[in-house]
Amino acid sequence: MLKINNDTKLFGVLGENIPYTLSPAIHNYAFQRLGINAVYLRFDVRRDKFHSIIIGLLNIASGLNVTIPYKEDVVKYLYGVSEEARVIGAVNTIHNLNGYNTDYIAIYNLIKEKLIDKPSICTVFGAGGAGRASIYALLKLGCEVYVINRSLERAQSLEKDFKEFGYDIKIISSCKPGDIIVNATPNSSYVPDECIKGKLVVDLVYNPVKTPLILKAEKTGIRSINGLEILVRQAMEAERIWFGKSLSDEEVVKFLYARKLVR
């Protein structure tokens, strides 16, 4: 049972329309297991209230996570951002008024752990904050990156942003045969069946864990990384930024299943 007192530190996740978020469950469990006197709350904030709320939270919170749709908006309120957050143009973790992108760290490390051979051609579906983090991870792994997005204008804006940092990505309208497919959209069905090929499929959707995309990858014998793996890894990366320590991914996943918070 959490006991709140004058020394209890405040953490939380800031987004809009996020009643589904598992972040409070994950981090409050981690605080308890790590012996940290802190509480983690959900801040579901409308766009017209964002400015006043973020200023208030940055003054009173010891650390924050940021999710849809504010990962890019929050950057201008910070003193500084890490190299990966600067290139990606999106922040999902804040500590001491500095911004980080643990989505990128999680995706990069999980792909590196899953693949033996260096990937060459990779396709990302989605050009939002998660798409940007995925693209940067693939670029740092040595991939030639192709992007498919419903909004051509947004995809071209992303292409321009990465080019400013010396990275070339290509916008395409249909799948290109390659090593890795990443779904960075909220809908795993956005990836056509004919695209599910290669060495690895990554789906950032985490509930259900076994999305249609992950199930199809497993059926065809392709290795996969599901959204829950990414969610938990990025959360533990945030814990390491805040406290210099974290739980194992396996323990957190086991906790979420035991509490029936994922299926």
Curated annotation (Swiss-Prot):
Catalytic activity: shikimate + NADP(+) = 3-dehydroshikimate + NADPH + H(+)
InterPro entries registered for this protein in UniProt: Aminoacid_DH-like_N_sf, NAD(P)-bd_dom_sf, Shikimate_DH-bd_N, Shikimate_DH_fam, Shikm_DH/Glu-tRNA_Rdtase
Listed pathway(s): Metabolic intermediate biosynthesis; chorismate biosynthesis; chorismate from D-erythrose 4-phosphate and phosphoenolpyruvate: step 4/7
CDD domains: NAD_bind_Shikimate_DH
Binding site for NADP(+): E83, G126, A127, G128, G129, A130, L204, G227
Molecular function (Gene Ontology), one example: shikimate 3-dehydrogenase (NADP+) activity
One Pfam family linked to the record: Shikimate_dh_N
EC number per UniProt: 1.1.1.25
SS bond list: none
Binding site for shikimate: T21, L22, S23, T67, N92, D103, Y206
A single GO BP: shikimate metabolic process
Protein keywords: Amino-acid biosynthesis, Aromatic amino acid biosynthesis, NADP, Oxidoreductase
Active-site positions on this chain: K71
Function comment: Involved in the biosynthesis of the chorismate, which leads to the biosynthesis of aromatic amino acids. Catalyzes the reversible NADPH linked reduction of 3-dehydroshikimate (DHSA) to yield shikimate (SA).
Subunit relationships: Homodimer.
Family: Belongs to the shikimate dehydrogenase family.
Protein name (database record): Shikimate dehydrogenase (NADP(+))
Organism per entry: Sulfolobus acidocaldarius (strain ATCC 33909 / DSM 639 / JCM 8929 / NBRC 15157 / NCIMB 11770)
Gene label: aroE
